[in-house]
């Protein structure tokens, strides 16, 4: 820990201060408390049942998800931008704290712990009690490693590139000596380049690792290497140390995590598809109870799918058979094209009602400090079949279909919503057109002494 010893201009290069602090704090907390990165066994942070049953996120993964959502939002800015030029507080926080800390983590991943910490020590010893900047840090890294790193720092500090390496295809051939030659086709779907650690997993669970380093401005390459046994699975960056935005294509078979769908648990690993399960139960007078199961598949903010299956205990008195009910809902966000869009599907056959729905959702965030409100656009349609009134009395009988548009403008002080819908003939019993406007005002005020002082004087005082 060396702050107070090295000085920097936080207006010009905030990341040199805050980025190092964030990276070192995370490294310490993960070393002290494990990959979770906080004292999760303390009653102050978690309940007993959570410690026993929940799956907790990796602290590094949390930070990576935070930055991935930001850099894919369409509002990313370079880390090296002067603090007062960032367009909003989110950009400042990401580019002063989170993104540079992840850059340093990637640097440690490439160099290895020994060279990375030697670089930090060289940086400290050479510039203690002096002012530092970007060039002085890079100089220490290149001096200790003996390699040029402009390709690495330029992309991180002065651009807003995205990295997404993928395994396109692979096969292996047995050599005469019993070893295997692997042919691995690697493709970068983004525009930021980095060496990749390739892990080969064998059928007995053992692994071998080798670096692919033909990454300089090379979007696609065939990597040929030898392994000692027949390979079962290949992975790029198996420890999820880099800010590769989508790990679903980093492995020939992505790992899975199956767990109970505990309320409030928000488990989002970077390198696993998560499956959660939950019992489901319906009841009506005809079917009696219909027990079933809900299964959810999710990966970060890119994918969320839900399937429900239920089977009635009693037979239908007319058709003389048990009823089977199902439900599917899926939400998907593209990684590269149409990043600001979300596509939602819903189709189900539930007690008394069948329906199909498709919706496109687009969110637009404000660029500046409170200059514009957040805006959300929805365009979609739904088709609802005849209602079985024997099983539900919540809907009127008859087919219903509609196309709709919704616009929500939301700030800290108000919400303004526009809702337009129109029936689709001849698929609807009712013909209608509807437009509605809703406006809500909200502003919370507290009148403690500091808020009054700030309002009257225009600045914040600090106490000791």
Predicted ranges, named:
Residues 1-185, 193, 206:
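Hydrophobic alpha-helical and helix-loop surface patches within well-folded domains
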Residues 83-84, 119, 270-276, 300-306, ...:
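Flexible, solvent-exposed coil segments and beta strand-coil junctions
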Residues 163-236:
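Long, His/Glu/Asp-enriched segments that create or flank divalent metal/ion-associated functional microenvironments
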Residues 181-185, 197-199, 222-224, 233-235, ...:
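Beta-strand secondary-structure signal
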Residues 21, 104, 153, 234, ...:
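Hydrophobic, well-ordered secondary-structure elements that form the walls
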Residues 113, 148, 302-304, 336-340, ...:
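Strand-connecting loop/turn motifs
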Residues 281, 340-348, 357-361, 378-380, ...:
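C-terminal outer-membrane beta-barrel translocator/porin domains of Gram-negative envelope proteins
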Residues 204-206, 224-226, 235-338, 359-368, ...:
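Outer-membrane beta-barrel initiation region
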């Amino acid at each position: 820990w060396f702050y107070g010893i090295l000085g920097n201009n936080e207006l010009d290069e905030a990341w040199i201060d805050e980025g190092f602090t964030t990276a070192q704090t995370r490294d310490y907390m993960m070393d002290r408390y494990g990959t979770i990165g906080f004292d999760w066994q303390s009653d102050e942070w978690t309940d007993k049942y959570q410690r026993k049953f929940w799956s907790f996120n990796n602290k590094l993964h949390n930070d990576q998800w935070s930055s991935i959502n930001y850099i894919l939002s369409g509002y990313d800015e370079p880390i090296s931008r002067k603090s007062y030029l960032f367009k909003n507080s989110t950009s400042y926080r990401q580019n002063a704290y989170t993104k540079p800390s992840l850059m340093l983590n990637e640097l440690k991943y490439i160099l290895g712990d020994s060279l990375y910490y030697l670089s930090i020590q060289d940086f400290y010893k050479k510039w203690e009690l002096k002012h530092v900047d970007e060039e002085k840090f890079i100089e220490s890294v290149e001096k200790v490693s003996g390699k040029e790193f402009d390709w690495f720092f330029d992309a991180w500090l002065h651009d807003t590139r995205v990295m997404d390496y993928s395994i396109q295809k692979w096969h292996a051939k047995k050599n005469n000596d019993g070893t295997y030659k692997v042919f691995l086709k690697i493709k970068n779907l983004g525009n930021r380049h980095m060496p990749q650690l390739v892990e080969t997993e064998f059928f007995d669970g053992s692994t071998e690792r080798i670096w692919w380093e033909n990454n300089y401005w090379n979007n696609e390459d065939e990597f040929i290497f030898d392994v000692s046994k027949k390979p079962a699975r290949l992975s790029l960056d198996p420890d999820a140390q880099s800010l590769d935005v989508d790990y679903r294509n980093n492995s020939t078979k992505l790992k899975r995590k199956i767990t109970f769908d505990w309320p409030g648990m928000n488990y989002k690993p970077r390198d696993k598809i998560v499956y959660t399960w939950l019992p489901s139960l319906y009841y009506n007078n005809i079917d009696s109870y219909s027990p079933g199961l809900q299964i959810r598949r999710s990966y970060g903010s890119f994918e969320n799918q839900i399937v429900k299956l239920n089977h009635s205990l009693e037979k239908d008195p007319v058709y003389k058979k048990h009823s089977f009910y199902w439900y599917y809902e899926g939400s998907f966000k593209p990684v590269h094209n149409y990043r600001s869009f979300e596509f939602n599907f819903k189709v189900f056959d539930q007690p008394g009602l069948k329906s199909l729905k498709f919706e496109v959702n687009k969110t637009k965030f404000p660029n500046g400090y409170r200059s514009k409100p957040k805006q959300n656009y929805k365009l979609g349609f739904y088709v609802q079949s005849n209602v079985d009134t024997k099983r539900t009395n919540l809907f009127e009988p008859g087919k219903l279909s509609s196309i709709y548009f919704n616009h929500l403008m939301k700030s800290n002080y108000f919400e303004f919503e526009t809702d337009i819908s129109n029936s689709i003939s001849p698929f609807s019993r009712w013909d209608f057109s509807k437009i509605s406007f809703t406006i809500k005002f909200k502003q919370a005020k507290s009148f403690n002494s500091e808020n009054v002082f700030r309002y009257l004087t225009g600045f914040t005082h600090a106490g000791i």
